[in-house]
Amino acid sequence: MALRGVSVRLLSRGPGLHVLRTWVSSAAQTEKGGRTQSQLAKSSRPEFDWQDPLVLEEQLTTDEILIRDTFRTYCQERLMPRILLANRNEVFHREIISEMGELGVLGPTIKGYGCAGVSSVAYGLLARELERVDSGYRSAMSVQSSLVMHPIYAYGSEEQRQKYLPQLAKGELLGCFGLTEPNSGSDPSSMETRAHYNSSNKSYTLNGTKTWITNSPMADLFVVWARCEDGCIRGFLLEKGMRGLSAPRIQGKFSLRASATGMIIMDGVEVPEENVLPGASSLGGPFGCLNNARYGIAWGVLGASEFCLHTARQYALDRMQFGVPLARNQLIQKKLADMLTEITLGLHACLQLGRLKDQDKAAPEMVSLLKRNNCGKALDIARQARDMLGGNGISDEYHVIRHAMNLEAVNTYEGTHDIHALILGRAITGIQAFTASK
């Protein structure tokens, strides 16, 4: 089985395997001892675990737990130590993608082509662990997996799949996704990028500009969407080094600073006909990609939220004011309870959506509902946690302000909070409200 295969792959290649085994053994001993003491002291009524309020753990498969725990070890041991300076210096370390490729977590739901073929829930758990460290790192993985590998797998020819997917899965190639333009954000149908067909040499000439593109300054492969002369919107595979193609970096971001963000500028880029994705000829192509990415985001932001909750809780327990811990304050306890409630509901909704995805029963509106809800709630939680830390809350050494600033961007990209409200509103009423004239 592919799922079992990736578990073995993660365990055999993943750093910190000894730590993971030690942690699992220690946890088992602690749990066993705790149950013995509890049985002696109390009746057998169910106990509440605030770290897993509705027992998510029991609803995951053994492979999903194994994949999550191993990737958590990698994230905490290899990524967490470097994020502080990476964020301060606005640096994305390219080798992270190679490391993820070694772990087998790029394009993980794709079957074959060197990919793991795991469940949608496993993919969500990976996104959650990665964004627990930083949204920028999760963005890089999401783009590679959902916005680059997915369209090649779903809309590409067999030749394109064989050529690109194995290298993308290994992290040997880094990809980006070009849809947003300077004058075309929430309305991609108004894109100005054009593709002119040259019948003489069976190629397309692309002209236009894409902006706010994750990974573009370091990308080897560019999935670009352009309007053709027949009015259809098609996907094109551009390779680094093509004449007329450039990808300048966007500087001065206050969000996602550990992620490389830039533009894609195409000035007469000639693309061979075999680099056109044959299975997409409308906005349904890029929207299908975005739907996959939004699903991962819905999981990921909860990882950031959990970090903020745990940090705020520990700070409230340690910080003494007026002779007592901050956690003694009723307002603090209410805030923690609100955070825990929203995270728990979000996680279990994501679990249900993941199971539906694997049964091909997940409508795009379901994804919009959770992307909108979880991103909005995650941003609220991060802001609240920052406030609970007082003046220390604005120090990046506590990491909460970094999560809060990152989530401002995550709440906006892949469909803004309000755009997803309109998607849901259309489903509820049967009336589209994106424009006034239609």
From Swiss-Prot:
Residues 1-44 form a transit peptide. Its main location: mitochondrion. One of its GO terms (cellular component) is mitochondrion. It is found in: Mitochondrion matrix. Its EC number is 1.3.8.6. Changing residue 402 to W: In GA1; most common mutation identified; loss of tetramerization; loss enzyme activity. One of its GO terms (molecular function) is fatty-acyl-CoA binding. The active site is at residue 414. Disulfide bonds: none annotated. Gene3D superfamilies: Acyl-CoA dehydrogenase/oxidase, N-terminal domain (1.10.540.10), Butyryl-CoA Dehydrogenase, subunit A, domain 2 (2.40.110.10), Butyryl-CoA Dehydrogenase, subunit A, domain 3 (1.20.140.10). It catalyses: glutaryl-CoA + oxidized [electron-transfer flavoprotein] + 2 H(+) = (2E)-butenoyl-CoA + reduced [electron-transfer flavoprotein] + CO2. The modification N6-acetyllysine is found at residue 240. FAD binds at residues 177-186, 212-214, 319, 330, 387-391, 416-418, 434. It comes from the Eukaryota. It is an enzyme of class 1 (oxidoreductase). It is linked to Glutaric aciduria 1: An autosomal recessive metabolic disorder characterized by progressive dystonia and athetosis due to gliosis and neuronal loss in the basal ganglia. This is Glutaryl-CoA dehydrogenase, mitochondrial.
